[in-house]
Amino acid sequence: MSEFLRIAMAQFDFPVGAVAQNAERIIALIEQARDEHGADVVMFPELALSGYPPEDLLLRPGFLAHCQVAIERIAAATHGIVAVVGWPQSAGSVVYNVASVLCDGQVEQTYRKRELPNYAVFDERRYFEVDPNGSRCVFKVKGVPVGVLICEDLWFSEPLADTVCGGAELVLVPNASPYERGKHAQRDALLAERARETGAAIAYLNVVGGQDALVFDGASVVVDGHGRVHPAAAAFSDQWLVVDYMRSERRFVPLQWVVESEVSINALVWRAVVRGVQDYCRKNGFSKVWVGLSGGIDSALVLAIAVDALGADQVTAVRLPSRYTAELSNDLAAEQCHSLGVRLETVAIEPVFEGLLAALGPLFAGMAPDATEENLQSRSRGVILMALANKFGGLLLTTGNKSEYAVGYATIYGDMCGGYAPLKDIYKSQVFELAQWRNRVSDVLAIPPGVIHRPPSAELRAQQTDQDSLPPYEVLDGILSLYVDQEQSREDIIAAGYAAGVVDYVLNLVRINEWKRHQAAPGPKVSQRAFGRERRYPISNAYRG
């Protein structure tokens, strides 16, 4: 019986749908774990073969058949090491979320996930079934009894307890758990509790990378049999974790182990958004991006994110001044581009705007200017930016934040134009926090202080500020956090100290702008309740409450 078991944990990105490429990479990583790291066991994240979440690809028989062929090929290439690989298994008319144990050229065992999440961003019950006969997977490597669970299984006490009853003392848990604020602390507390309940040691491996609106943070850990959580991998980093499990003490000794000092929430959110932009571009064939730069804080923050994600040479900023654009706005945009080394172009919207006014003039005769003319300016900018991306290639990043998406303070087919929205899940007050944080952590000034300290304005009419139409952002975001993120009622929000008239005004804006959000570009989820797949409200909705 061996004193230790060496485990290689593959915290890498496995793109959705790239079955053949993922299979090739898994085989290469298995060989690397065996030959370079001397591992006895190598584990891969949940559904690593298909990527997570594959969504309705799982309804395509050809996709599932491709996965079956690929897992057999991986098994045939696995020798001198045990590999645990996640994939979607088709069995007749049903599909299971599984992790297979591969050894000596074949599939030795297959564990089927017991707990299928069907809340927030997860809808696994749409695709997967639970094995009616139950599922338990325990195997021995060098005399050590090892169990397997998958992600959500660990959030319930019974699956781990049952696996330990089956003889496991070390449990491997592949995951695909997306990032959100505060999740690390919640997860670590849960892992510690499960280990203390059972005395089992846990190797918790999470996938890393952006997938549309989801960003998986990795941040994998190991937990000893006494419930001590050992951070093992940097968040949002592609890397190996190699540890020796010391059986006599039920603890882990690091071989390849990255320990980070405590990371702030702002730092994690920044990494999530940067990784979201980076991977969305890479996985959809974009090497460069465009940003409409107004001299305001939202577009300035998006520009800094884009530079961190892709590099300054892959980012082009565009000023689009109008008759209402302050000279300070133009100057601040130029200052930021100079500081970051970003190419800056300028296209005045006045000719386009004037042309639209002239074309519509006969129909608008005798009517006072209103939001229509303001929106024409925004749509003029959208047309120009989309034309530049269309002509020269690249992805247009839209610059709206969560506060604006919530209350509709954005122009559909105007400033909402673009393919990805980096700030979609970040409230305006958090935009200011992130801008100040980004400036503190770099010698290069990312966002000019003048941008941060000036009153926010859309500059669509003379002397305009956001607070002409909206409550102060600290009030607005407080109400939105309660209503959107926490699903609190009007009465609860008023009881929290907000004026009834302001609450009614804000809640009505949220309700009547659902149609805009349904047409918004995707953006990285960083909160517990993001707009998109986890907040599915009807557009036609008579409920008030």
From Swiss-Prot:
The active site is at residues 46, 113, 151. Residues 5-247 form the CN hydrolase domain. Residues 269-545 are annotated as: Ligase. One of its GO terms (biological process) is NAD biosynthetic process. It is an enzyme of class 6 (ligase). ATP binds at residues 292-299, 399. It comes from the Bacteria. GO terms for cellular component: cytoplasm. Pathway: Cofactor biosynthesis; NAD(+) biosynthesis; NAD(+) from deamido-NAD(+) (L-Gln route): step 1/1. GO terms for molecular function: ATP binding; glutaminase activity; NAD+ synthase (glutamine-hydrolyzing) activity; NAD+ synthase activity; nitrilase activity. SUPFAM superfamilies: Adenine nucleotide alpha hydrolases-like (SSF52402), Carbon-nitrogen hydrolase (SSF56317). Keywords: ATP-binding, Ligase, NAD, Nucleotide-binding. Deamido-NAD(+) binds at residues 375, 404, 516. L-glutamine binds at residues 119, 177, 183. Catalyzes the ATP-dependent amidation of deamido-NAD to form NAD. Uses L-glutamine as a nitrogen source. NCBIfam families: nadE, PRK13981.1. HAMAP family: NadE_glutamine_dep. This is Glutamine-dependent NAD(+) synthetase. It comes from Xylella fastidiosa (strain Temecula1 / ATCC 700964).
